[in-house]
Amino acid sequence: MENQKMPISSVSNLKDLNMISRPVANFPPSIWGDRFINYACEDENDQAQKEKQVEELKELVRRELAITVDKPLQQLNIIDATQRLGIAYLFENEIEESLEHIYLHTYVENTCFEGSDDLYSVALWFRLLRQNDYRVSCDVFNKFRDNEGNFKNNLMEDTKGLLELYEATHLSVHGEEMLDDALEFTKTRLESVVSHLNYPLAEQVRHALYQPLHKGLPRLEAVYFFRIYEAHASHNKALLKLAKLDFNLLQSFHKKELSDIARWWKSLDFAAKFPFARDRLVEGYFWVLGVYFEPQYSLARKIIIKVFTMISTIDDIYDAYGTLDELELFTKAMQRWDVGSLDQLPEYMKPCYKSILDVYNEIEVEMDNQGSLFRMHYAKEVMKKLVEGYMDEAKWCHEKYVPTFQEYMSVALVTSGYTFLTTISYLGMGEIASKEAFDWLFSHPPVIEASESVGRLMDDTRSHKFEQERGHVASGIECYMKQYGVTEEEARDEFRKRLVKAWKDINEECLRPYRVPKPLLMRILNLTRVIDVIYKNEDGYTHVKKAMKDNIASLLIDPMIV
């Protein structure tokens, strides 16, 4: 990180200095400009026609889900296609009833079904029930292992079955060594055969090895699956058409939403006021779409994206610009949460602090209208705690202090921002986000710690080199290396093991019976998925390269051809 001299006019209370040395990170600018500010509304007649088609097709699909009730395998395949095409949210009740029926008859009553001796069918059955939070045992795969516990050799040629088993293994919980073995077995075999397969199976295998379904963003996975599903001659034409129409309607809805937010963001002029900070509104909105894309969560998205942009700027003030004295002032102002604190801040900090108060006041009015004013207490407290964590890291950086790994993680889990983002994600979710739900969240349950761990460990793993080059606070990799006297690669291996553990914790916490309503758990799962996607190979939020550009284009630029 470069130390650059900045004019004293940008700060206050330091009149005895002419220039201040600042640790500027030189983040790349936004690549989008004003692209998403203007939104051309679709012709109302065309829109109405598409909506009518969607309603008609929904009835067709609804009937098909009901018709297959006594054919579990056929029903599982329709449910799988519905979910992978991104339209399961349209049929939540029907899918829940179908899976409940299948669970009771094939698992509780142990009734055999067509395909119950076939690896693909059993793995699909297991994955869909686990994916929908049913506690089914992995012992169902014992029939595919020999007396020594190894998977049978005759499975080696069943690529379709191996692929389905591979996807199922990512839903494992602690104590399921069989699924750990299955993951290693299927991954090794699929990697060895992928270059010899034909389309579309080759593409399915290649994609799954890169992005397992369970850890992917449902809407992004749907974009990929459209062409795979269409390539199968036996695909359900009504289902595919419905999925494409719904995708395009939702994309228009999201583009309008982003256009409104982009105009608000431009009116703040943060790009000019905070040129040292990351200008990542579009990337932030993509992040939020990963948390919830459904139309009923429009208010929730508008709330979280505004807060998201604020906290991204605050992060960079602490991380890449502010002096320790200035950051102390800002931290104290955040604890007071009072517009009167503006006068005590350096000039450049004032627009950010004022905007935070304004955004929270706007949210408070909405919460008051809903009779949910109690939520603001949690929203403010989690912000204060996050800023305190940023301050701790700033002190470490200033003192060139390398904490123990345990000390580092006690702060770094907070500054991962995932308890913060989960709290904010609940604000616009309606009555389901009760006081009891917020109290549960603030008790720091295992699923939250696991989500924070994924966020922190993946961030540290992907951004370690860049952060160290710019003189950032010691990363988890660096802390672990120093404390345990290991190499960087050994530290990375340990992080990979911890990521596996964290995902198992998340999978376990999402199984029935739920501690809080499922939609609230889904926010945590989806936030964790976002990290897996954006930080797959690098910090795609800070350094927006081809993968991130393509993902954003898929959801917010390119429509489906119906």
From Swiss-Prot:
Top class in the EC scheme: lyase
EC number: 4.2.3.-
Cofactor comment text: Binds 3 Mg(2+) or Mn(2+) ions per subunit.
Residues annotated for Mg(2+) 1 binding in this entry: D315, D319
Sorted UniProt keywords: Lyase, Magnesium, Manganese, Metal-binding
Entry keyword annotation includes Transcription: no
Domain of life according to the entry: Eukaryota
InterPro entries: Isoprenoid_synthase_dom_sf (IPR008949), Terpene_cyclase-like_1_C (IPR034741), Terpene_cyclase_plant_C1 (IPR044814), Terpene_synth_N (IPR001906), Terpene_synth_N_sf (IPR036965), Terpene_synthase-like (IPR050148), Terpene_synthase_metal-bd (IPR005630), Terpenoid_cyclase/PrenylTrfase (IPR008930)
Location of the motif DDXXD motif: 315-319
Name of this protein: Probable sesquiterpene synthase
Lineage, highest ranks first: Eukaryota, Viridiplantae, Streptophyta, Embryophyta, Tracheophyta
